[in-house]
């Protein structure tokens, strides 16, 4: 799965809206929207917060991390 699909799946497994997930990982709603739309890639701070969210909610973080490492926003380098 691609990073946008992985992050959306993690959010939906906890039955959260994009807004609620954004609050959990300490970013703006629009940021989560851009991640899921493939228009942005989380920075290291955001990835740390996503990892903490996954650990707290018993979600496999490794697939998200792998997808993040392989993901590049169109028009930008990895």
Predicted regions and their residues:
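Short alpha-helical DNA-recognition segment
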Residues: 15-34
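Short basic helix-loop element that most often maps to the first helix and adjoining turn
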Residues: 5-20, 49
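Short, charged recognition helix plus adjacent turn
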Residues: 44, 61-78
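Residue-level recognition of specific faces of alpha-helices
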Residues: 6, 31-34, 46
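DNA major-groove recognition helix of helix-turn-helix/homeodomain DNA-binding modules
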Residues: 45-63
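Residue-level detection of the helix-turn-helix DNA-binding "recognition helix"
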Residues: 8, 12, 26, 37-39
């Amino acid at each position: 799965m691609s990073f946008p699909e992985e992050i959306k799946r993690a959010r939906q497994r906890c039955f959260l809206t994009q807004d609620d997930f954004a609050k959990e990982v300490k970013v703006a709603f629009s940021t989560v929207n851009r991640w899921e739309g493939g228009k942005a890639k989380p920075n290291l701070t955001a990835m740390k917060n996503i990892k903490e969210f996954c650990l707290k909610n018993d979600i496999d973080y490794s697939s998200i991390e792998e997808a993040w490492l392989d993901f590049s926003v169109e028009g930008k380098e990895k």
